[in-house]
């Protein structure tokens, strides 16, 4: 159970970081 929760948290963090990087690249491209 703990491994599943930690895995889900890691996946959520990875998705958030990717989303932030994608938005950052789009902003740089707009400028």
UniProtKB/Swiss-Prot annotation:
InterPro entries in the cross-refs: Cyt_b6/f_cplx_su6
Regions that span the bilayer: 4-24
Top-level taxonomic group: Eukaryota
Family statement drawn from the similarity comment of this UniProt entry: Belongs to the PetL family.
Organism phylogeny: Eukaryota, Viridiplantae, Streptophyta, Embryophyta, Tracheophyta
GO molecular function: electron transporter, transferring electrons within cytochrome b6/f complex of photosystem II activity
Membrane topology: Single-pass membrane protein
Record function comment: Component of the cytochrome b6-f complex, which mediates electron transfer between photosystem II (PSII) and photosystem I (PSI), cyclic electron flow around PSI, and state transitions. PetL is important for photoautotrophic growth as well as for electron transfer efficiency and stability of the cytochrome b6-f complex.
Localization per record: Plastid, Chloroplast thylakoid membrane
Keyword list, A-Z: Chloroplast, Electron transport, Membrane, Photosynthesis, Plastid, Thylakoid, Transmembrane, Transmembrane helix, Transport
Name this polypeptide is given: Cytochrome b6-f complex subunit 6
Keyword Chaperone among record annotations: no
Biological processes, Gene Ontology terms: photosynthesis
Any single GO CC term annotated in Swiss-Prot or TrEMBL for this entry: chloroplast thylakoid membrane
Quaternary data: The 4 large subunits of the cytochrome b6-f complex are cytochrome b6, subunit IV (17 kDa polypeptide, PetD), cytochrome f and the Rieske protein, while the 4 small subunits are PetG, PetL, PetM and PetN. The complex functions as a dimer.
Gene: petL
């Amino acid at each position: 159970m703990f491994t599943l929760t930690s895995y889900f948290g890691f996946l959520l963090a990875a998705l958030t970081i990717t989303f932030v990087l994608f938005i950052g690249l789009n902003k740089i491209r707009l400028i």
